[in-house]
Amino acid sequence: MSKLFEVLERLAATIETRKGGDPTSSYTAKLLNDPALAAKKLGEEAVETVIAAVAQGPDALASESADLLYHWLVLVAASDVSLDAVADKLAAREGTSGLAEKAARPS
């Protein structure tokens, strides 16, 4: 198993402990209390990740990817979507052509 998955599992658990926390003393609690803000931050991090990928090199991409994954985990938690629900969606798509899967989605 990749070290990434172990780190993400620990990070997700830490994020869960911040639910109900004081948003004035915890950035994570602040995002968890405001899913729209969490979504905005994820969007910003996605753009920064793309910029790093095309213009800043591997180290910047790794750093921005870490920020992106953190903010994604926070948004999922803030929206009360379990990681298992996301995993189920991914598992259901395994073995299916990306083009076929996308075409089968409801509009």
Curated annotation (Swiss-Prot):
- Known Gene3D superfamilies for this protein? MazG-like
Q: What class of enzyme is it?
A: hydrolase
Entry's SUPFAM superfamilies? all-alpha NTP pyrophosphatases
Q: Which reaction does it catalyse?
A: 1-(5-phospho-beta-D-ribosyl)-ATP + H2O = 1-(5-phospho-beta-D-ribosyl)-5'-AMP + diphosphate + H(+)
Top-level taxonomic group: Bacteria
GO biological process: what's one of them? L-histidine biosynthetic process
Location of this chain's protein in the cell = Cytoplasm
Family matches, as Pfam families: PRA-PH
| An example Gene Ontology molecular-function term | phosphoribosyl-ATP diphosphatase activity
Q: List the disulfide bonds.
A: none
Report the EC number(s), separated by commas if there are several: 3.6.1.31
Q: Which GO terms describe its cellular component?
A: cytoplasm
Q: In which pathway does it act?
A: Amino-acid biosynthesis; L-histidine biosynthesis; L-histidine from 5-phospho-alpha-D-ribose 1-diphosphate: step 2/9
What UniProt keywords apply to this chain's record, in alphabetical order? Amino-acid biosynthesis, ATP-binding, Cytoplasm, Histidine biosynthesis, Hydrolase, Nucleotide-binding
Task: Report the family membership.
Answer: Belongs to the PRA-PH family.
The record's annotation in HAMAP family points to:
HisE
> What is the protein name given in its UniProt record?
Phosphoribosyl-ATP pyrophosphatase
Which species does this protein come from?
Answer: Caulobacter sp. (strain K31)
| Gene behind the chain | hisE
